[in-house]
């Protein structure tokens, strides 16, 4: 049975408590929160690992609305970011029952991003999280084939491709190509 989670970018800038309430009111099965800083000017941050009051309010809202937390985002791999800083976000997500983390890669240095993605995957696994890598045509992993190559290189049982249909279309990925791809690579779509 297909389930639907309210992704953060559907209503960007919305605090976790309101996003959880909106997800419930709209009939979603779960919610996806952005709890990792994007380091973008003017973007609100909802860092559950750094703000105990926000964490408690988010936990209370999940319970009040009986709304599971599916995933957190966005664990980016970029040369100027230290991925070890994601661990506290993964820990708090797991405490709230999350099953997944969404990530993306922003460098073309394949050896470096493969090694770094392995670290993120292993860190996520410590908290029972699946690591879902999104490809974008202007990022480091630009298309479905590059994502498959990375997943195969990582050889970990908690790493998947997250297909954002908007970006897949921009990358020239067809429905036929997706249908021909082994479903073992996929966990969820946007």
Question: Which residues are covered by each model-predicted region?
Answer:
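Acidic/histidine-rich catalytic cores of soluble enzymes
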Residues: 3-6, 119-190
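N-terminal pre-domain/capping segments
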Residues: 1-100, 125, 156
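Active-site groove signature of glycoside hydrolases
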Residues: 93-111, 127-136
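Active-site beta-loop-alpha junctions enriched in small/polar residues
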Residues: 7-11, 34-38, 74-77, 105-108, ...
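Conserved strand-to-helix beginnings and helix N-cap segments that scaffold or border functional pockets
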Residues: 16-17, 83-86, 114, 144-145, ...
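Active-site-adjacent beta->alpha loops and helix N-cap segments on the catalytic face
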Residues: 53, 108-120, 140-143
């Amino acid at each position: 049975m297909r389930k639907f989670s309210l992704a953060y970018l559907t209503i960007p800038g919305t605090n976790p408590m309101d996003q959880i309430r909106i997800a419930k009111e709209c009939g979603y099965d779960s919610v996806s929160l952005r709890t990792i800083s994007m380091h973008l000017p003017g973007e609100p941050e909802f860092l559950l690992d750094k703000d105990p009051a926000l964490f408690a309010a988010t936990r209370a809202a999940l319970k009040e609305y009986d709304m599971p937390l599916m995933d957190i985002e966005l664990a980016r791999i970029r040369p100027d970011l230290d991925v070890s800083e994601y661990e506290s976000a993964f820990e708090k997500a797991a405490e709230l029952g999350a099953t997944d983390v969404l990530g993306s890669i922003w460098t073309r240095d394949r050896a470096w991003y493969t090694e770094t993605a392995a670290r993120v995957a292993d860190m996520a696994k410590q908290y029972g999280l699946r690591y879902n890598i999104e490809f974008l045509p202007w990022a480091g992993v630009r298309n479905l084939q590059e994502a498959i190559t990375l997943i195969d290189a990582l050889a970990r049982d908690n790493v998947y491709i997250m297909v954002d249909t908007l970006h897949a279309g921009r990358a020239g990925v067809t429905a036929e190509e997706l249908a021909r791809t082994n479903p073992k690579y996929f966990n969820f779509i946007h």
